[in-house]
Amino acid sequence: ITAEDIKTGPVQQTYLNGDVTPYELYIKMLMEYFSDRVLATDAQDAFDMPEGYDKYEYQTDAVIEGYKKLLKYDGFFLADVVGLGKTVIATMIAKQFCIDNGYENTKILVVYPPAVEHNWKQTFKDFGLDKYTRFISNGSLSKVLDEENYDYWNADEYDLVLVDEAHKFRTHTNTAFTELQEICKMPRVETGNIPGFKKKVILISATPMNNTPADLYNEILLFQD
């Protein structure tokens, strides 16, 4: 092909020859940067709220953004302030994960402080996820690592781990951190529709950094090398 061919050939008939208006350029930019958010809203099942729950736009936005980060980085911080419904947001993200990975392919572990045990169990039940979930208080993680404890699936069977009040695991030298890190970083023994053997981790906290940036670093080590 020669330069003359380009000038006289069929390439001249493409849209590239036309003038692009500022408006068209703006729309193209929006699609490039935000198309994943637009498409994500089509997955309505995750946003179907059970009776007694209200749907808020900020929660829907948080689910879309959080889920995108979960798939891209294998984990993320859900760090809204107190009272904005982090439990519901995390549950909706877990539901979207189940939809995409396949419910029967998915096992979830929720790690929580004892004071909020009922809240987590009730919310997961309301959203229809309790069948695919085990719940453990943040001081009893050794039970998950005990292969003879049949109240829990083996640690390598979990696909998604949710950690409430994740700032309690900011110290990498204590036993609880070591146990949680082992659970989170133990490869999935089987995968569902979502590929990859790394577990997905959601760290939930209103105060992810209590003292120094080292707090964040240690918590990130729960899902990153």
Label every PLM stretch briefly.
Residues 76, 108, 202:
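Conserved beta-strand position immediately N-terminal to the Walker
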Residues 216-224:
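A short helix-turn-beta junction within AAA+ P-loop NTPase domains corresponding to the substrate/partner-engaging
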